[in-house]
C-alpha cells in the first residue's frame, strides 16, 4: 500500500514569527549547531556557504538572513520562503539593495518557470525539518 503524504507546509512555516526570529540565531546558529550537531556556524557552515556563493544567488528557506549578511556588496540575492515574516527579516538584514527578488513560494509546488536558469548558486539551510512527513 502506498501512503500519500498530506502536505501542509504552512504548519512548518507559521512558527517563524517576528518574535521567534529574534531568538532564532542564538538558538539555531549558536546552541543547536554547536552542541546538538557539532557543526559550529562560523567555523564550518559560514565558510562553506561563502565558498560556494555565486554572484546571483537564491536562498531558499531564508530564516533570519544571517548567512546573507556576509555576502559581497556586489552580490544579487533572491529570497524564497513561504513565510512573509522570514522574507522580510532576511531582506532587511541582508540589505534591501542586494535583494533582486522576494518570492513567497511553497517548496512542494513547482519552481517558477520564470526563474529557471537565473541563478549561479542556490542555498537551502534548515528547511527539511520544517516540511511535513518523516525524514
Predicted regions and their residues:
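Conserved class I S-adenosyl-L-methionine
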Residues: 2-53, 66
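Local beta-strand N-terminus motif with an aromatic residue
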Residues: 54, 119-120
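Class I SAM-dependent methyltransferase SAM/SAH-binding core
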Residues: 58-111
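Short amphipathic alpha-helix with an adjacent loop that forms part of the alpha/beta core around
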Residues: 111-117
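A conserved beta-strand element that flanks and buttresses the S-adenosyl-L-methionine
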Residues: 123
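Hydrophobic adenine-recognition pocket in adenosine-nucleotide-binding enzymes
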Residues: 127
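A short, conserved alpha-helix within the catalytic core of class I
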Residues: 131-135
Amino acid at each position: 500500500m502506498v501512503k500519500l503524504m498530506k502536505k501542509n507546509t504552512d504548519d512548518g512555516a507559521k512558527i517563524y514569527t517576528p518574535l521567534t526570529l529574534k531568538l532564532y540565531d542564538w538558538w539555531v546558529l549558536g546552541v543547536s549547531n554547536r552542541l546538538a550537531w557539532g557543526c559550529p556556524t562560523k567555523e564550518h557552515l559560514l565558510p562553506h556557504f561563502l565558498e560556494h556563493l555565486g554572484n546571483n544567488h537564491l536562498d531558499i528557506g531564508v530564516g533570519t538572513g544571517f548567512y546573507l549578511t556576509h555576502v559581497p556588496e556586489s552580490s544579487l540575492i533572491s529570497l524564497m520562503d513561504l513565510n512573509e515574516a522570514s522574507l522580510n527579516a532576511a531582506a532587511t538584514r541582508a540589505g534591501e539593495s542586494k535583494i533582486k527578488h522576494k518570492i513567497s513560494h511553497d517548496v512542494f509546488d513547482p519552481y517558477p518557470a520564470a526563474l529557471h536558469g537565473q541563478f549561479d548558486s542556490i542555498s537551502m539551510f534548515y528547511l527539511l525539518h520544517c516540511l511535513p512527513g518523516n525524514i
